[in-house]
Structures are given as C-alpha cells and as structure tokens.
Amino acid sequence: MALKIRLARAGSKKRPYYHVVVADARSPRDGRFIESLGSWNPLLPKDGERVKVDADRVKHWLSHGAQPTDRVLRFLDEAGLAKRDARSNPKKAEPGKKAQERAALLKKAQEDAAAAVAAAAAAPAEAEAATAE
C-alpha cells in the first residue's frame, strides 16, 4: 500500500481549510484517510497558527515509507522535519526573448544619447579653439 502525506480540503466555498493526512495514494483527495497529522489554513496571515503539524507522528509515518506531496514537503522543510531538494532551473531566471531585445534597444539608445552629449560638448570646445587662433 503506497502511503502519501497530503492535504485534504475542508471548509466552505471560497474559504479553504486543509487537513494534513496520511492516506493511501489511491483514495480520493477528501476521502478515507489513515490518520490526521495537522492542518493548514491558507487564509491566515503568515504566523505560527497557519500550519500546524504533529512532528512525532510525521516522523513515524516518514519512517514507515509515506511520501509527502510537494506542498506538504514545503511545510515539513520549514518545520525541519524533511529536506526538500532545491530545484535547478537556471533558464527560469533569464529574461525572455522580447525582454532581451528591449534591453538591447534601450542600451543602444543610451549609448547613442551619451555619444550625442559628448559630441555636443566637444563641438563648442573646438569652435572656441578655432576662434582663439
């Protein structure tokens, strides 16, 4: 039997509340579960009451082979109960093709403007030097 530590939705419409449960992977999301391990209230602001988890029971089920889902693994990582691997997606941080084109155009425009200012500053100096001779 494949066990999952996952979220079971409770609460009413537009007011979600989740229970952290251990359940068979084949059972429905809000269906039968083996044990309730805690809760998550996403509507609360960031405080200690937002996520509540029974650490001893989580350790017990992890030692028995229960696999946490991604969201639950985030909670367990914050609580120091499980280690979440860092994702390596370096292309995600790079700007898109259009943004790169816009940045190149902006850089070229700034360089042209700087060159024009330098040329304008040099022109009166040359005129002054020519009149002084």
Swiss-Prot record:
Span list, region Disordered: 83-102
One GO biological process term: translation
Alphabetical UniProt keywords: Ribonucleoprotein, Ribosomal protein
A Pfam family this chain is assigned to: Ribosomal_S16
GO CC list: cytoplasm; small ribosomal subunit
InterPro entries: Ribosomal_bS16, Ribosomal_bS16_dom_sf
GO molecular function per UniProt: structural constituent of ribosome
Biased composition (Basic and acidic residues): 83-101
Family to which the UniProt record says this protein belongs: Belongs to the bacterial ribosomal protein bS16 family.
Protein name: Small ribosomal subunit protein bS16
Organism the protein comes from: Mesorhizobium japonicum (strain LMG 29417 / CECT 9101 / MAFF 303099)
Lineage, highest ranks first: Bacteria, Pseudomonadati, Pseudomonadota, Alphaproteobacteria, Hyphomicrobiales
